[in-house]
Every structure is written in structure tokens, then in C-alpha cells.
Amino acid sequence: MSTPDLLVQDRPAALRRLLARPELGSLIAAVAVFVVFAVVAEPFLRVSSLGTVLYAASTIGIMAVPVSLLMIGGEFDLSAGVVVTTAALTSSMVSYQFTAVTWVGVLVSLVTTLAIGWFNGWMLGRTKLPSFIVTLGTFLMLTGANLGVTKAISGTVSTKSIADMQGFESCRWLFASEVTIGGLTVKATVWWWLGLLAIGSWVLLRTRFGNWIFAVGGDADAARAVGVPVARTKTVLYLGVGFGAWVLGQHLLFSFDTVQSGEGSGNELIYIVAAVIGGCLITGGYGSVAGSALGALIFGMASKGIIYAQWNPDWFKFFLGAMLLLAALLNAYVKRRAERGPR
Amino acid sequence: MSTTRFRPSRRFWPVCAVLAIAVTAAGCSSTGGRRAEEARAKAAATGGSAVTTPRWKVAMVTHAGAGDAFWDTVRKGAEQAAAKDNITFLYSNDAQTQNQVQLVQAAIDQKVDGLLVTLAKGDAMADVLGKAKAAGIPVITINSGEEYSAKFGALTHIGQDETTAGQAAGQEMAARGRKNVLCVIHEQGNVGQEQRCSGAQSRAGAGFQVMYVNGVNMPDARAAISAKLQSDPSIDTVLTLSGPMAATGLQAVQDAHSGIELDTFDLGPQVVAGLKSGSVGFAVDQQPYLQGYQGVDLIWLYKYNLNMLGGGKPVSTGPQILTKDNADALAEYVARGTR
């Protein structure tokens, strides 16, 4: 022990390790939200409600995984919300217009979202502009393109139904099916979420690439000096966001058959909220993937809990904002305490 | 230089107090404000329930964005009917399809006794309404989605067919001899708005143009409309598609300084004032209050007596054409938020 700090030394090592975890704040918040709604909302504890809450959390969580990785890497993606809609629109229109098996649309959509992610990363590396500006640009462009292209091709603002096309059923099975386990209805998005969560956590904590993510987010210049390919790391992180958007976009398409072109915008901030509640620092270099899952879960519990509790949903956004502030404060506090202790 | 400290005389504080009272008294507005609103609320009939049925629970899930005056009126109607019918009324809304679907699912989880849903997103609601049906919850669709309603197993639909409403507006404009109409769409990509404009175009029998403005940025919308009016002096009629947009349209017409008539869909305080003063020619109303009120009331009738208005055929709440003749009566109802 190099720093003599009586306060910290007094604590057992296990507790100290726990306090240093980025997820701690969100774990406390998640438990608190759960307890509140379990007490005030009778339907909240029903198994069927749990399925609804998990589903709501998964539709945020699928994107919160790559978005939190990106934030640990020190960057934003404001286009993350509309890319989801782009993914769904691309898949639907490609399949419909070419009368192709729906898998063709699904694959074209994957290529498209990865290309958008690559574009964001490439622009960032090339121009050295802040990612806030670069992705704000792609966000606006995609919002316009979603509407413009859809209208030009289908004549209306939503896509035509592809429910009767070949391959729809198998795609639906992959992206939008549901299984009932002991009364609990689990949608496909929940499996995708858990899968992405496991992969994201493993990459971040157990691989060299994970170390690179922390390095480029903590101090890009220092990382470059020790040989970390900074631009390439960030581009891969943007590709990850593209992949997440593809998964969620396919889910939207195959569970609802048609896609509205104007949707998705605004959700990028929800993903960032989930990541921040989960302990990601907005300046990068610190955070966790598991925390983003807790953030998404808090979001799912809060958004549906308010309905189950029969509260006035007009206040939902207020509640969410207060949660965000509290989580950020708690994280800052915990981090300060942890940094005071020995490393 | 010496500074003299302000030393209040003995009379200072009493004078202050008298002044404060005087200002407070004189400062009371004899018109408008909260007091007037409370008086109106009292005047609007409320009262307890008039029935002896058990306390049923009815949920309404709409595609409305937050803080929309139109949906507030729908809600008021539903709450009024709920009070009368001894019903617990639950309201929730989300403009995004997947979130609205989740809200409907949450209502089903709560085991509500009846469900009112808007189908602005059509196909997307098929699955979840199937679940409502499987759970034995009676569903009535309101406002939008008439074409899907029966297909998804709803008991009936209460709303206005937007194409019909557009045609009614077109006919009225033709009757009024309007020559060149500018239809202002304020939500790019809203199917209902497109239908209103194209319906009006089909019956207007005049020059007809459509322009798109950004409805969530009113100064921008106003500037866009007045720029259009200035650049094309042959336009003699502006057709807006909502109450708030009509107010913006009126400002734009004033900017343009020309004898342009504004006609609109839906109502609002400014629209009624405009009808009264003559700056608004007519308004096509779909009676949002009725959509909420009838929705709840029809659920009650169905559960109480298995009744269904129109035998399950869509029930129209509009188009109702309102002109200067109705303005006086409407003013009061708009002010209390039920029109």
C-alpha cells in the first residue's frame, strides 16, 4: 500500500473492489426502481409484466451495448437512433422492390448499417472533427434520406407489408419470435440483448481490443504513442453500433411488418442515457457494458412501471431526467472514492 | 464624500403596506387567467357517476406526442364519460410504434376491462391486438386506422375518414369560390395529412399546391408560409391541417398583407377567434372530445348491455364544417378545452 489513507485502508478489500466497479451506481438505482414499483404497482410483479419490462429493456439494451463501448472509447453516435429505422427500411424495401427472399433484404441492410458505421468512423479519423458534429451530420442526413427515399420508392411514408413474402417466417423466427417459459414470454430481442451483452463484456474485459478501447477513450495521444491503432479502434466501435442497429431494425420490421420512415430520432439519447446511468463517463476511458444493461433495465422498469402504477405518464420524461442526474452524480461520487484508494 | 444612509421614516412601512395592498388589488385581472378557468371548469358539468355497474378499468393508448392540445381534448371527453360511467380511466401515449405497442401490452398485463387504441401505424398493432382479443378484452379503435379496425378484431371504430374530411373541405372551398389554394402539411410523412390535402384537391376545382413546413418549429413555419405567399400572389386561400398551425398560418397571412382567406382542419382558441373576426373562413372539425367520450361510453354499453353503435360499422365523428355562425357558441367550449 503506497498511499497511506486510513479511511480506505480500514475497509475490507472486497468492499473496496465493489465500490470501484462502474456498475455500482446503476445497480443501486435498478434495485431502488424495482422496489418502488414492486410496492406501488400491483401488476408489476406479475410474470407477464416481467416479460413486457424485459422486452422494453431489450429494445434499448441492444443498442446500449455498442453505444456504451463507443462511449468508453471516447466518442458519441448521435445517428444511432435513426440508423435503426434506416436498417428496417432498407431491409423492407430491398426485399419488396426486388421481390426477393426477405433474407436478401436482411443482408443488404447489414451491409448498409455497417457502411454507415464505417463512414462515421472514417470521417472522424480523417477530419479530426468532434464525433458530436460528424454523427450529428449523419443523423440529419439519414433522417432526411429515410423519409425521402421511402417516399420516392413506395409513394407513401411507410413501407409496404412484406409479411406474405418468402423467408419472412424464418426471419421472424430469428428476430421477432417469442417463447413462453413458465408463463414468462421472452421475445427474441432479449436473447439478442443477452448475447451482445456477453460478447461486449468479454471483448471489453478479456481481449486486447478491450484494452485498446479503454486506452483510446482515456488518452488517445498516449494510446497512439504506445502503438494502439486509434482510428481503426474507433471505426470498429462504430461498426458495432451499425451491427446493433441492424439487429434492432430487423426486429422492428419483422415484428411489425411495415416501417414508418419518420421514426427513431430521439432514441440515440435514450441509448446514451442507458450507458451513462450504467456508469460510462461522457469523456471516455471508463465504464462498463454490464452497466448499460442495468441502465436499459431501469429504463424498461420505469417506462412500464409508471403505466402499471397508473401514474400520469406525462411525468415520465421528468422521472427519466432525474434518474440520469442522480446516476451521474452517484457515479462521480463513487469514482472519486475509488480513486482515492490504492490501485 | 460622505454617504448618507437611507433611513426610513416612521411612516415608511405603513405607506409601503398600503401601496402593496393597492397594487395587489389593482393588479387583479378581471378577465382571463386562472380564476376564469376555474369558473369555467365549475360551469362544465362534472358530478359523480350515474350508473351502478362495478368499477371497470378502461385504458386508452394513443400515438400522440407529448403535450398535444388535440389529445388533451380527447382525454377530457374520455374522462367525462368515465366519471359518468363509474370507470377508472387510464391514459398513456407514445409517438413511436414500438413504444405504443409496449404500452398496449402493459394495459393487457394490467387486465383492463376495455381498451381504446389509435391505429395510426396500422399493421404494427395486429399482434398485440390479437393478444388483447385472446385475453378477452373488448377493443375499440379511435381517431385513426379505420381500414384496419375490423381486421384486427376491434368492436368498432370511432373517428373521421381523412379523405372524406379533405373532400368536405374541398367542396366548401369550391362553394366559397376560392381560386388558388395552398395546403400546408406540417408533419412530413403523416399519411392522414396527405389524405386531407389530396381529398381537398379532388373537390376544390381550383389551383392547388401543397407545401411542407416544420410543424415543431413555428417561427420557421410562419416564415416559410409567408415567403410562399409573397412569392406567389395568386394564392388566395391557405388551408392548414391543425389548430396550432392555423394560428401560425394566420400570422403568415398577416405578414403577407393581402386578402387571403385561411381555412383549417381542427379547432383551437385562435381558430374560433378567427371565425368570429372573419379571418378564418371555415374549420373542418373531427370532434376529438366525442372520440374520447364515445370510446369510453361504447365500452361501457358493450360490457353492460352488449350494445354496439352502428352494429360495428365505423362511427364518424366528422367532418363537421364550422363557420362564423357557430363561432359564438364555440368560443366558450374551446375555452374550457372540450372542443
Q: Could you say what each language-model-derived stretch is?
A:
Chain B
Residues 43-81, 85, 90-102, 119-122, ...:
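Extracytoplasmic "Venus flytrap"
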Residues 100, 156-181, 220-222, 267-271, ...:
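Hydrophobic alpha-helical segments within soluble ligand-binding/sensing domains
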Residues 58-60, 65, 78, 167-212, ...:
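An alpha-beta-alpha
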Residues 23-27:
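C-terminal motif of bacterial Sec signal peptides marking the signal peptidase cleavage site
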Residues 123-164, 268-276, 280-281, 329-331:
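Flexible loop/hinge segments that line or gate small-molecule binding clefts
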Residues 117-133, 200, 214-273:
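Hydrophobic alpha-helical
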Residues 29, 37-54, 203-204, 290-339:
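Hinge/cleft segment of the Venus flytrap/periplasmic-binding protein
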Residues 88-111, 210-232, 246-248:
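Structural motif
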